[in-house]
Design a protein with these regions (language model features):
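Basic, polyanion-binding surface patches
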Residues: 2-161
Length: 161
């Protein structure tokens, strides 16, 4: 083993990534078919119909499932969902798969987290690569807005209350 006087894997700091970290964002869970992914880079566009736009990993199974099924569920997560968010983000092990970390209900849009009070059933409108992400633009078809106590927020690379 070698002891380094500096970081052993020096990388230049990415100013765009640092800007994104300073913005922070509400953590959501996107599911479609048998796939899911935590997403904190998202926005909602008001209109008739309303829309949800999310930046997702272009190599993720979620992208493939959304494009194949054309529908999905977007749920807003709470502090109690931290472990589930880590499992769907691929940062912690999930023996048996990430869907074993929660209780699920089946909807016409796919599986939704049963104890997430706010969720939207969405229909995919378009998927475009932008930067190192895929921009999923989805029409809100069904929406339930519930209690928002103790939201799960991601800022500077960690979860906050």
């Amino acid at each position: 083993m070698t002891i380094h006087s500096s970081h052993p894997f020096p990388t230049p700091e990415d100013p765009v990534r640092r800007l994104r970290g300073r913005l922070g964002g509400r953590v959501s869970l996107w599911t479609s078919g048998s796939s899911g992914l935590t997403v904190s880079s998202l926005m909602v566009a008001n209109g008739s119909p309303g829309a949800v736009l999310g930046l997702i990993d272009p190599d993720s199974d979620l992208r493939d499932e959304l494009e194949e099924t054309g529908v999905g569920v977007v749920s807003l997560l709470h502090w109690r969902h931290r472990d589930l968010a880590e499992a769907f983000g691929g940062t912690t092990p999930a023996p048996g798969g990430a869907f074993r970390t929660g209780t699920w209900e089946t909807t016409e849009f796919g599986r939704r987290l049963a104890d997430a009070p706010t969720w939207a059933g969405v229909r995919l409108v378009s998927m475009h690569e932008i930067g190192w992400s895929a921009l999923a633009t989805c029409e809100i078809v069904s929406l339930e807005v519930g209690d928002d106590a103790d939201p799960l927020v991601h800022r500077h690379g960690r979860y906050e209350r």
